[in-house]
Amino acid sequence: AMLKYYLLAVPQMAAQMPKLSTEDVTIVQLLGSKNSELHTPSEIIYRIAEKLNARPCLLFAPILVGSTQLKESFQADPAFQEVYEAIRRCDISIAGIGNAARAEELFLQGNVAIKPHLLLEPGQYVAGEIGSHIFDINGNPIRMNIQNHIIAVELEDYRKIPTRIGVAGSEEKLSAIRGAMLGPYINVLITDTRAAKLLCEE
């Protein structure tokens, strides 16, 4: 149920967006896709672009590849470089905030599980994930030895986006939301009343 909630948060936001007539707006995909996802990033990009009368800019790549060399091949492709330059020019990002279960599920492709690849410090544990970036309860990034296999906006470039919106709700997401705010991975939060109340009480 919690995974379903995460998967539906951003797609539902896209579905509820009113149609607007905008000019010179581009909607850019920030990370690669998984075939098993209920709502793929490219599908969400298309939906938002349609609502805003904007141009979609898609990242045609998987989120996880088998080697550093394969990632470098993608990065060397002119089409990829064009999309990544668009990412660097982004003014606003919108991303769901996943909890620890989502972080573990995100990269689960074939026989690749995330747990053995986490480089945890003593006492550190996974609190959440946003845009493929995994963090602890205090918002500290958790390093992975497969970082060079992931195709997504790099953390340094993501944090340069001026307005970073996180979408998440429910009491079960509190640790993830808190970590995302402390990072700070986000500077705007869209959440539900219950989660907002609990965060304010801390």
What is each of the regions a protein language model found here?
Residues 18-26:
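A short alpha->loop->secondary-structure connector
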Residues 28-30:
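Alpha/beta-hydrolase-fold catalytic nucleophile elbow
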Residues 20, 32-202:
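Conserved phosphate- and dinucleotide-binding cores of soluble alpha/beta proteins
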Residues 1-19:
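Helix-turn-helix/homeodomain-like alpha-helical modules used for DNA recognition
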